[in-house]
Amino acid sequence: MTGAREGGRWLRAWGFNMILVTGSILAREDTFDDVLRACLEHVERSRSEPGCISHDVHVDCQNPMRLFFFEQWADEAALRTHFAVEGSKAFVKYLKGRIVETSGTKIYRAEPIPR
């Protein structure tokens, strides 16, 4: 694969399944800027990991303190590796005490639907 996004097109073109991950966090108002910065750094680092097709964070339009994550991974092994990376562990640890709540991580298997 030449890159995360190019790899995603390759996987879909050949009909491979992928792993989708969603989740959200609600930042405290007084820590939002620091939490957002940490989220953006985490996303940028994660995008360079093997098997990462996409990794994004978005601000919720209805509640700007909520940050929503959407990730696509080539397979479960890539996701397990991502969770085991020291940077991922440090990110989760950093968030503790800076957020009000989390929706938890939801993980799905997805496959392309033929057109």
Predicted feature locations:
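Active-site-flanking beta-strand signature of metal-NTP-handling nucleotidyl enzymes
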Residues: 19-25
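An amphipathic, aromatic/His-enriched active-site/gating alpha helix that lines ligand/cofactor pockets
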Residues: 45-53, 72-106
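N-terminal amphipathic/basic-hydrophobic helices that include classical n-h-c signal peptides
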Residues: 1-17
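Short, surface-exposed ligand-recognition loops at beta-strand->loop->(often short) alpha-helix junctions
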Residues: 27-35
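Hydrophobic pocket/interface hotspot
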Residues: 23, 35, 39, 55, ...
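Short, glycine- and small/hydrophobic-rich beta-strand elements in well-ordered beta-sheets
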Residues: 43-68
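Glycine-rich beta-strand-turn "strand-cap" elements at beta-sheet edges
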Residues: 10, 15, 57-65, 92-115
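Short hydrophobic/aromatic beta-strand micro-patches
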Residues: 26, 58, 70-72
